[in-house]
């Protein structure tokens, strides 16, 4: 990843200019199939959820607070928060206006498997990064990474990686674990992936071009 000044929205060799300032739903869809590494551990993103400032389910809906401050920061930076006081959740700040983010819900683990298994315990590969809490534990993501740029270490985000699954076939449906806007189909995932955290019953199927 090339170095990026803190004063500008980040870009990388795998993420074109303007990628992070588009509508959050487009970004959430396009992140599916990309490779995310944290200190060399990670894999292919197979599930995401989009949230924006006008979304009643979003942390930013009621405005800026100490907890959600990173959501109002620069696009292409991390927003990490603790869910239910138990586990960390990793989001990427994005969107055309402040207050948007995409939650990374699940990965197909491919790199640094031994280190991730040590963090998570001796479990089967399918459950290593299936769900936002498990994902953060496996990758070693904590609130110490909140606000960091995705353009520099420990993060590395790269273009699509072949997993042997139908990565171009993406499903969209309602998000998981929320109490507002529960019917909004802003969850995106690889339709055939066994590493997806929630139900694979979709509202509709789209491809990488959004068709």
UniProtKB/Swiss-Prot annotation:
Pfam families in UniProt: Pur_DNA_glyco
Gene Ontology biological process terms from the UniProt entry: base-excision repair
Keywords of this entry: DNA damage, DNA repair, Hydrolase
Superkingdom of source: Bacteria
EC number assigned by the record: 3.2.2.-
Enzyme class: hydrolase
MF term (GO), any: alkylbase DNA N-glycosylase activity
PANTHER family linked: DNA-3-METHYLADENINE GLYCOSYLASE
Family to which this protein belongs: Belongs to the DNA glycosylase MPG family.
Protein known as: Putative 3-methyladenine DNA glycosylase
């Amino acid at each position: 990843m090339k170095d990026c000044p803190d004063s500008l929205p980040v870009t990388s060799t795998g993420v074109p200019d303007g990628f992070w300032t588009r509508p959050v739903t487009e970004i959430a869809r396009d992140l599916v199939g990309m490779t995310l590494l944290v200190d060399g551990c990670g894999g292919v993103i197979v599930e995401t959820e989009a949230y924006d400032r006008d979304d009643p389910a979003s942390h930013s809906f009621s405005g800026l607070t100490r907890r959600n401050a990173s959501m109002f920061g620069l696009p292409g930076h991390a927003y990490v928060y603790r869910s239910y006081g138990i586990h960390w959740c990793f989001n990427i700040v994005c969107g055309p206006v402040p207050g948007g983010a995409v939650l990374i819900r699940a990965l197909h683990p491919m790199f640094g498997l031994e280190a991730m298994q040590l963090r998570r315990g001796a479990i089967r590969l399918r459950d290593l990064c299936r769900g936002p809490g498990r994902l953060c534990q496996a990758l070693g993501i904590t609130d110490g990474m909140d606000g960091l740029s995705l353009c520099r270490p420990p993060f590395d985000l790269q273009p699509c990686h072949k997993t042997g699954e139908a990565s171009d076939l993406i499903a969209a449906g309602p998000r998981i674990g929320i109490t507002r806007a529960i019917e909004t189909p802003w969850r995106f995932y690889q339709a055939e992936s066994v590493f997806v955290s929630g139900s694979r019953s979709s509202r509709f199927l789209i491809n990488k071009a959004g068709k």
